[in-house]
Amino acid sequence: MQKEIVMTEALRRKLINAGRVLTSQDQGDFVAGHVTVRLPDDPGRFLMKPATIGLEEMTFDNIITVDLEGQKVGGTMPRHNEVFIHSEVLRARSDLQAVVHTHAPHAVAFSSLGRELVPVNNEAGYFYQQLPVFSETSDLIVTQDRGKGVARCLGRHSAVLLRNHGIVTAGRTIEEAVWIALKLERACRVQLMAEWAGGPKFVAEGEDLQKKNARGNRPDLYTNVFNYLVRMWCRDHGKADDPCCAEHHVQDESAYQK
């Protein structure tokens, strides 16, 4: 029991930091947007950012617990109406542990063009021909049926564009789900820049694309980028003594020559 409590506290810290990271990278939208993580000892339930607050305002005390029916089973604050994005993706994909939904502005703008995301920059290669677009509605996902539709659209992928709405990303860890959200927004932003300049004339392809994808999708990057952005947030906000900041000074050096 003590081990489970410690593990849940660690997940709460990561969830808090995920909200801080997403906001610091301009994926906050006032009190919209949410991130979740499955409870390892109870896979039918997950921790979730509550409604009515910003992503960066999560604390140990206000995070809520929700089941796969979308019902709040723990916590005092209200749950988001779009809970079904998370409950249905986690129900459909037992391999996934974390889900992010934001109204990432460049991704929303890009989704309105009806164009394919192509490998203009390093990040975009990850999504090339691997980025489904959910177009059943551009409205909020406030029913189980709509949530199931998002989960079907996601399929075996790790990201989906919600047309004229936002993004959904998912991963085996919080760090991975956040990293994919950051990569997708950056890829959309860079392609929009190319479109504004007349459209991309050159993109990565063939062996170059394969090598870039292999390097850009290493698990150590999920951890190192997440930890870096947490440290940056803590420095910028004078929170060096915050317990949520303390554990992010370790780097994963497994992919580098010593």
Predicted features by range, described:
Residues 1-258:
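Glycine-rich flexible loops
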